[in-house]
From Swiss-Prot:
GO terms for molecular function: antiporter activity; xenobiotic transmembrane transporter activity. This is Probable multidrug resistance protein NorM. The chain crosses the membrane at residues 13-32, 47-69, 90-112, 132-154, 166-188, 193-215, 244-266, 286-308, 317-339, 359-381, 388-410, 420-442. One of its GO terms (biological process) is monoatomic ion transport. It is a multi-pass membrane protein. Keywords: Antiport, Cell membrane, Ion transport, Membrane, Transmembrane, Transmembrane helix, Transport. Multidrug efflux pump. Belongs to the multi antimicrobial extrusion (MATE) (TC 2.A.66.1) family. The lineage of its organism: Bacteria, Bacillati, Bacillota, Bacilli, Bacillales. CDD domains: MATE_NorM_like. GO terms for cellular component: plasma membrane. It holds the Pfam family MatE. The keyword Ion transport applies. InterPro entries: MATE_fam, MATE_MdtK, MdtK-like.
């Protein structure tokens, strides 16, 4: 990141920041995408098992990943304010925190997974695949969370192209292992959805190893000497980190877990409905990678400018990010409307699943505008380190408005499973409105503060 003086310079720098993040997120998502699509071609039961497993795993992983994402705005503001010497301490303490969080998640999962799955009244093969999927994924928790911290450090320096290269190097490993283990090629057993979990876990370890090697040997990362000194664990540092990270993590958890909750509630419907819902939701999540990537870029850009006390520049980056998100939303809405049949065919060859997935995809169009506003706005707010109010706003929008409304529509109207999608759409719309208002308030506060300091 560097200081800019014109709007065109900011736009160029933002796009150069965003594009590698986008490729990185798409590559990471591709792992989940291939897990789902390949499992679906193994059988509808494998697809349903992976759907249930990921619906439990994703909210947990994204919520804790969100907490660890606090590394990015903290480091970005330190770099912006010329406090490079403080960065290694922040990163190492965050790594310690990531490892501790990993063990806590594994311990809770050991006791909680079986009761959760038993309470869902799934078909026996689906429950078995989901349980095995989660058991294997647990082995990849430590590398995934540790990588999240190290990626936050790399991205905060504006070197998003590096994380893109790391992920692109790892993606072929995931695809090849999926192909071999799910379908049983080259003498390996045919494991179905369980093979997808093994492939993802192995890939997480590969990503971590590559990242550590780059940080130790390549500039500008090596000059920070991140691993030169292993600082003693500092509870006060953890507390400061968590003050920012916990609201970020819970805000992400509230958003992702509502989708997972809907998938779990779908267990009351048939395996066909679960599979169709998972296919449509998986593609909607693919499109979500764009506003999510824009949000990450906004956190870096806004955080850098706020650290340097260039508040007007931070405000301009906010508008650039939201404008680009709305443009992409329009493009994706057109894609969903005209190519729903082709998209559904990617996930399944089962006629019933295919037909129902097409119906769900139409609802995904309505997700686009809300996601285009809410997600980038959250990224900008993180750059300002304003996270507590947005946490409350997302809780209300998604869990007080969206999910209860979806349950009512699905249970007491003829919409059935589609009622959950309508509830999600309305909840996302409220969330986008709340968050946009908050961003305007924060920008105004910093504008007034800037005038007073002159």
């Amino acid at each position: 990141m560097k200081e800019t003086s014109t709007f065109s310079q900011k736009l160029k720098q933002f796009v150069l920041l965003f594009f590698p993040i986008f490729i990185t997120q798409m590559s990471l998502f591709a792992m989940s995408f291939f897990d789902t699509t390949m499992s679906g071609h193994a059988s509808p039961i494998d697809l349903a098992g992976v759907a249930i497993g990921t619906s439990i795993w994703i909210p947990v992983s994204t919520g804790l990943t969100g907490i660890l994402m606090a590394t990015t705005p903290i480091v970005a503001q330190l770099v912006g304010s010329k406090k490079k010497e403080d960065v290694p301490q922040v990163v190492i303490q965050a790594v310690y925190l990531a490892i501790c969080a990993s063990f806590v998640v594994m311990l809770i999962g050991f006791f909680a997974v079986t009761p959760i799955l038993n309470g869902m009244r799934l078909e026996e093969p689906v429950e078995r695949i989901a349980a095995q999927f989660l058991s294997i994924i647990a082995i990849g928790i430590i590398p995934l969370f540790t990588y999240t911290v190290l990626r936050g450090f790399i991205d905060a320096l504006g070197k998003t192209r590096t994380t893109m290269i790391i992920t692109l190097l790892s993606l072929p490993i995931n695809v090849i292992l999926n192909y071999v283990l799910i379908f049983g090629h080259f003498g390996f057993p045919k494991l179905g959805g369980v093979g997808a979990a093994i492939a993802s876990t192995a890939t997480y370890w590969c990503i971590l190893i590559i990242t550590v090697m780059i940080i130790r040997t390549k500039e500008p990362f090596a000059s920070f000497h991140i691993f030169k000194q292993l600082y003693r664990p500092s509870l006060s540092s953890w507390k400061e980190f968590l003050k920012l990270g916990v609201p970020i993590g819970f805000a992400i958890f509230f958003e992702t877990s509502i989708f997972a909750a809907v998938t779990l509630m779908m267990s009351n419907f048939s395996t066909t409905t679960i599979a169709a819902h998972q296919a449509a939701m998986n593609f909607a999540s693919l499109l979500y990678m764009t506003p999510l990537s824009l949000a990450m870029a906004m956190t870096i850009a806004v955080g850098f400018e706020v650290g340097a006390k260039r508040y007007n520049n931070a405000k301009q980056y906010g508008f650039i990010g939201i404008g680009l998100a709305l443009a992409f939303a329009l493009l994706y809405s057109i894609l969903l409307y005209f190519f729903d049949d082709e998209i559904a065919s990617i996930y399944t060859t089962d006629i019933q699943v295919h037909h129902l997935a097409k119906e769900f995809l139409i609802f995904a169009i309505l997700f686009q505008i809300s996601d285009a506003i809410a997600t980038p706005v959250q990224g900008a707010l993180r750059g300002y380190k304003d996270v507590n109010v947005s946490l409350i706003m997302t809780l209300i929008a998604y869990w007080v408005i969206g999910l209860p409304l979806g349950y009512i529509l699905a249970t007491y109207t003829d919409w059935a499973a589609k009622g959950y999608w309508i509830g999600l759409i309305i909840g996302l719309a409220f969330g986008a409105t709340f968050l946009l208002i908050r961003l305007f308030q924060v920008q105004r506060k910093y504008t007034i503060e800037n005038r007073r300091s002159r």
